Amino acid sequence: MQIHKLCFLALFLANAAFAVKFNFDSFDGSNLLFLGDAELGPSSDGVSRSGALSMTRDETPFSHGQGLYINPIQFKSSNTSSPFDFKTSFTFSITPRTKPNSGQGLAFVIVPAADNSGASGGGYLGILNKTNDGKSENNLIFIEFDTFKNNESNDISGNHVGININSMTSLVAEKAGYWVQTLVGKRKVWSFKDVNLSSGERFKAWIEFRSKDSRNTITIAPENVKKPKRPLIQGSRVLNDVLLQNMYAGFAGSMGRAGERHDVWSWSFEN
C-alpha cells in the first residue's frame, strides 16, 4: 500500500511540475506568437489597439492567421502515454464587413508546431490546405466556430460548432447555440437557443477534456450568460494517437474574398 501511495505521489508531482495555467483578460502582445495575418486587433480609430487577438485583416482577401501561446504546452508525460486533463475558455466575436457573409470562421487549435506555412485561407481556416487535409500525421485537433458552409468539408451549415481532428471535416458538429433549463409546472425542461456566430456579438466558449474516460465537452453562450449546465457537444474520443507530448495551443481563423474580423477578447487555459 505504501509503495502504491509513493507511486501515485510521484506521478502527481511529475504532472504538477509541467502544469500550465494562465488567464488573459485582454492581450498586449506578450506571451503570444503571431503567425500569418494574426495581430493585436486595431481599434475603430485605426491607430490604437483594441485589446483583442485578431486572426485576419480586413483589407486582405483570404486573410488567415494563427495566434498561439508563446511556449509549447505539455499534454502528455511522453508521446506514448495518455493525455492530461485540460480545460480552456475564451470570449470571441466574428464580425463580417460585407453582406452576404463571406466566412469563414475561427477555431481553437492544438498544433504540433508554431508554423502555419502549410495553411490556407478560405475554408481551411488558416489551419490546413488542400494537400494535407485529412492526413493522420497532421497531429492536430481544433474546435471550429464555422460561419460558412463548405460542401467539400461536409459542413452541416454556415453557422455551426465542430470537433475536428487532422481534417476540415468535423467528427461531430452541431448548429450554434446553447441549452437553457426552465421549470414548466413541476418539470424541468431543456430548450435550445440559437445564436448567430457572425453577428458581431461576443460569445464565450468552454472546452474541456477529461482523460480517464476521454470525455470531450464544448459549451457556448453569449458573453453575459452563465455557463450552461448542458454542453452543446459532448462525447468520448481517445486522443492518445493525436496529441503529442508537447504542442502549441491558441487560435486560427480565416476569411473569404471579403472582410470578416475574427477576434479573441480573453482566454484562460489550465491542465
From Swiss-Prot:
Induction: By oligogalacturonides and the diterpenoid compound sclareol. Accumulates in response to mechanical wounding, chitin, methyl jasmonate (MeJA) and ethylene (ET) stimuli. Disulfide bonds: none annotated. Keywords: Apoplast, Ethylene signaling pathway, Glycoprotein, Jasmonic acid signaling pathway, Lectin, Plant defense, Secreted, Signal. GO terms for cellular component: apoplast; cytosol. InterPro entries: ConA-like_dom_sf, L-lectin, Legume_lectin_dom, Leguminous_Lectin. One of its GO terms (molecular function) is carbohydrate binding. Expressed in rosette leaves, inflorescences, roots, leaf veins, carpel heads, and silique receptacles. It comes from the Eukaryota. One of its GO terms (biological process) is cellular response to jasmonic acid stimulus. Belongs to the leguminous lectin family. PANTHER family: CONCANAVALIN A-LIKE LECTIN FAMILY PROTEIN, LECTIN-LIKE PROTEIN LEC. Plays a role in defense responses triggered by jasmonate, ethylene and chitin. This is Lectin-like protein LEC. It comes from Arabidopsis thaliana (Mouse-ear cress).
